[in-house]
């Protein structure tokens, strides 16, 4: 989904798995800015797909300066012994060798133009050809331990939340990290909520933003170095109840993660 983080995909991966794909490409290298919870989310995606019998290929792109979230994603790909195509590095190498210019590849600072997509497709097909020529005799085994902390190896998703008469949702969970995903629209409204952990307001999120893309956003609500029991609460911001239809459109979901413990 355009303009989203790998943490958004945590909420969509099971829907994708219903299609029973043989292979998925994960492309978040120019969207994820590199925060801890996003590298945890990316590893959670890789592990979940592999655990469900779907193979994974990591795609790395870059901005016009050659930058992306290369470090963490490369480390995860190597750790899980899955293919990684660093298209961004290939693009920058071609530019350094004067084979083409950035504007020949992209229409702006990051998005490929038609010729750029053709270049990407050619490189992916080359990877397929290489894979078919290489004989693989060993069966794939998923690592027993995570590359990083494994916070989203066992993700619990809370969806279709039920609010009480005061439009408050409360739940107690043993966790170390909590993310919230929600819809945001450019259509003007005053629907907003506070998300609290153990009585402390962590985030205030709004359904409206004038520059919204009318898609789903994700926020890291809470992260701790050690898992424990916590009370998570969603309530109207400022004590003012929201329109029920707008609250339904908001469609807030929670992702509950927990560090793997010995």
Task: Give the label of every model feature segment.
Residues 1-5:
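Short beta->alpha junction loops
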Residues 8-134, 185-189, 194, 198-261:
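Alpha-helical cap/lid subdomain in secreted, periplasmic
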């Amino acid at each position: 989904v355009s303009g989203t983080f790998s943490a958004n995909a945590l909420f969509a991966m099971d829907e994708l798995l219903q299609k029973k794909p043989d292979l998925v490409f994960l492309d978040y290298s120019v969207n994820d800015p590199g925060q801890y919870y996003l590298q945890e989310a990316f590893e959670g995606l890789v592990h979940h797909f592999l655990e469900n019998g779907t193979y994974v290929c990591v795609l790395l792109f870059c901005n016009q300066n050659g930058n992306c979230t290369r470090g963490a994603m490369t480390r995860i790909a190597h750790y899980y012994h899955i293919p990684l195509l660093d298209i961004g590095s290939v693009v920058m190498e071609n530019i350094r060798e004067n084979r083409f210019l950035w504007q020949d590849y992209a229409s702006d600072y990051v998005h490929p133009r038609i010729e750029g997509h053709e270049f990407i497709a050619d490189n992916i097909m080359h990877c397929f050809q290489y894979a078919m020529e290489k004989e693989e005799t060993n069966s794939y085994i998923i690592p027993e331990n995570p590359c990083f902390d494994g916070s989203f190896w066992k993700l619990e998703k809370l969806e279709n939340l039920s609010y009480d008469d005061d439009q408050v949702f409360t739940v107690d969970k043993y966790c170390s990290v909590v993310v919230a995903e929600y819809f945001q629209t450019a259509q003007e409204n005053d629907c907003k909520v506070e998300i609290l952990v153990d009585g402390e307001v962590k985030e205030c999120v709004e359904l409206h933003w004038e520059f919204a893309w009318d898609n789903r956003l994700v926020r890291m609500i809470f992260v701790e170095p050690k898992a424990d029991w916590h009370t998570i609460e969603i309530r109207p911001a400022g004590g003012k109840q929201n329109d029920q239809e707008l609250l339904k459109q908001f469609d807030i979901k929670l992702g509950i993660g927990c560090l793997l413990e010995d």
